């Protein structure tokens, strides 16, 4: 089924509600995606891009119901990746002599995927035009490394539509095609997620390329992307966001993520977050366990943040594998204008935190001091973590923070109070996780100093997600 975009332009793409992994398993498409292909019917009939290769047969069948394939005069391939040009082999088997307009780099990419050097390729470069009749032209603009060397955009005069390729798109599937028809919160979340995880490495190219396109002084009434919605309502809003995101973007936000074997590094993360909030209650702090979180959400939060704290247990003298993998991805994304600090617990020998700190520095982060704790952090160690958080809050503040005269209560007083007033520690009978009233459970809004009797009935064990009824008094404290 086609959808009218504007005048003689129709969407003939494919929705993919089920896809959950993109670029292998590197991008989680939690809201599906779409592969946008456009059919222009003027004096000349033009097809802009195809769809993902797994929908090749369906795409050609649907296209045949819209137009006699032999009547397609030109094919435009803005990008040779398989989710854009994947149906070319199926299509060209029907119309093998139809000219394909693309960049020189795209010929190499297309042949690399489809192995048909005999196809009728027509190389275009920035400023080249193609007359499609009725007083209208297609103008081509090369956009190398946004995000492949072969990438380009195509502008249609008369209708003032920019076919923008991957730029300004999002992996977002909806029955509606246009930006003003969908949930705006979801849409802009997916736009930022897409930019943070795919286009961030090329931020230095975004601003000059947008400036170059604006320099053509061409009106833009619509931006027709390769994935997600078509921008018809105030289409320049997404262009303005790209310019903002490309300019060393950061919010007053700190992201903390960690992996842990025995919950010790998690305790450190909670305490560090408490310290940050004590000194700067206005900064947004998000905590993620990488083993249980969507990594693309973590990376999007890193993109938004002024700084990141990364925690790892030590395993065989090195960091946890999921942490190592995520730091490697951050290295490839080449975040700019970000600060970082490493922390973690260890047993008889360390090594992971130092290695992690070096990796973060190699990834381009401005480093602050790291923090280590041996074994399970006691009250003294947790106070050091909170102090580390306070120090980080001051060092990373975007504006000077007021001095505080509040003094931290001596550890001995806290210990006495805990033993006398807060009741016993509780242990999950399933996974052995221990609830310490002195520490609380900040991720579930249970403040430090909360006795078990005051913990809400909807409390869930953070390790196994079972309720309060599976908890018993810790054996060493039972009377």
Curated annotation (Swiss-Prot):
> For binding Fe cation 3, which residues are annotated in this chain's numbering?
428, 431, 461, 464
A cellular component term (GO) from this record? cytoplasm
Rubredoxin-like domain location, by residue? 423-474
Q: How does the cofactor bind to this protein, according to its record?
A: Binds 3 Fe cations per monomer. Binds 1 FMN per monomer.
Under the heading SUPFAM superfamilies, the entry gives:
Flavoproteins, Metallo-hydrolase/oxidoreductase, Rubredoxin-like
Subunit comment: Homotetramer.
Protein's name according to its UniProt entry: Anaerobic nitric oxide reductase flavorubredoxin
Q: Which gene encodes it?
A: norV
